[in-house]
């Protein structure tokens, strides 16, 4: 197991290097001149040229890339073109709000999604199954921005129960986490149902019932462990989606997180921040997949990595 983990960690290096090259080329192909955006609409050509020189954008592309990659390998992601603050500080100040929002969304999405999926599988083709899958399809189909605006209209504007924007108290997390986790809960419900339906028809489940074990214990002890293996894979992918895909929700609720920072950086063509955020999101997905693979062995001891 240890050798497997070490090999996967070493495999991070070429993957992140490829991502670094691709994101560098991507941001430099974006239309628009960051020097012109920073200098302002009233700036003349001389001022824009001076700003471009200060930002290092007047150098050839290969020189810019060499400067970028050598600094990244040293852990230096540069300075934001807009705020003139180190990129690491910009990301650090926005990381925790996004992380806590992701964790909050993931907790309720997994609990409710798995509960609905298990109930739908146990009472398959009956009203709990139909109701649960109807809710799941609705949650997947409903756009996140529309759901967020609907929740804000009802609970913030009409009823006045919850705040609309900000991240100062636990109440600020309710509406964004519900909006962000709705699609994940729906996916988890459908995936859990599919996995449980397959497990419930296995021989060891029938054997446990024949021995007189209660249905609840059969489902929780014998069914849950075996059904969780594919569900854990989806759980890891969805966690990565939440952590890196909260851009729309953060924009709707004016959430001070990484998603909103990325949108603002793309608008201003803030190359260093865009590059650092994409690298961070890539690293998160790779590490989450590694954790999921390791959890396989914990859930099912029959699985071993060599």
Curated annotation (Swiss-Prot):
Lineage start: Bacteria, Pseudomonadati, Pseudomonadota, Gammaproteobacteria, Enterobacterales
Gene (UniProt): gsiC
BP-aspect Gene Ontology terms: transmembrane transport
PROSITE patterns from the UniProt entry: ABC_TM1
Protein name: Glutathione transport system permease protein GsiC
Gene3D superfamilies documented for this protein: MetI-like (1.10.3720.10)
Annotated transmembrane regions: 9-29, 103-123, 135-155, 169-189, 229-249, 279-299
PANTHER family (UniProt xref): DIPEPTIDE TRANSPORT SYSTEM PERMEASE PROTEIN DPPB-RELATED, GLUTATHIONE TRANSPORT SYSTEM PERMEASE PROTEIN GSIC
Pfam families: BPD_transp_1, BPD_transp_1_N
Chain's role: Part of the ABC transporter complex GsiABCD involved in glutathione import. Probably responsible for the translocation of the substrate across the membrane.
Family: Belongs to the binding-protein-dependent transport system permease family.
């Amino acid at each position: 197991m240890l050798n497997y983990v070490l090999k996967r960690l070493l495999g991070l290096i070429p993957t992140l290097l490829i991502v670094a090259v691709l994101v560098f080329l991507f941001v430099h192909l974006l239309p628009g001149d960051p020097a012109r955006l920073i200098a302002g609409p009233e700036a003349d050509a001389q001022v824009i040229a001076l700003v471009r020189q200060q930002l290092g954008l007047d150098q050839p592309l290969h020189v810019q890339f060499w400067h970028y990659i050598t600094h990244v390998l040293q852990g230096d992601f540069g300075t934001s073109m807009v705020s003139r603050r180190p990129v690491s500080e910009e990301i650090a100040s926005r990381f925790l709000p996004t992380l806590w929002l992701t964790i909050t969304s993931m907790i309720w999405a997994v609990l409710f999604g798995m509960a609905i999926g298990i109930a739908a599988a146990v009472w398959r083709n009956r009203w709990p199954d139909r109701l649960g899958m109807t809710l799941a399809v609705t949650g997947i189909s409903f756009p996140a921005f529309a759901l967020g605006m609907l929740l804000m209209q009802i609970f913030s504007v009409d009823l006045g129960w919850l705040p609309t924007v900000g991240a100062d108290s636990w109440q600020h997390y309710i509406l964004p986490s519900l909006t962000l986790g709705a699609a994940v809960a729906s996916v988890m419900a459908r995936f859990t149902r599919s996995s449980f339906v397959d497990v419930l028809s296995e021989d060891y489940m029938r054997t446990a019932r024949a021995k007189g074990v209660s249905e609840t214990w059969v489902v929780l002890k014998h069914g849950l462990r075996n059904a969780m293996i594919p569900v854990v894979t989806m759980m890891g992918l969805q966690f990565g989606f939440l952590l890196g895909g909260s851009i729309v929700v953060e924009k709707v609720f004016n959430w001070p997180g990484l998603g909103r920072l990325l949108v603002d950086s793309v608008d201003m063509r803030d190359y260093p921040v865009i590059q650092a955020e994409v690298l961070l999101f890539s690293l998160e997905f790779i590490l989450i997949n590694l954790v999921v693979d390791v959890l396989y062995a914990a859930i099912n001891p029959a699985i071993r990595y060599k």
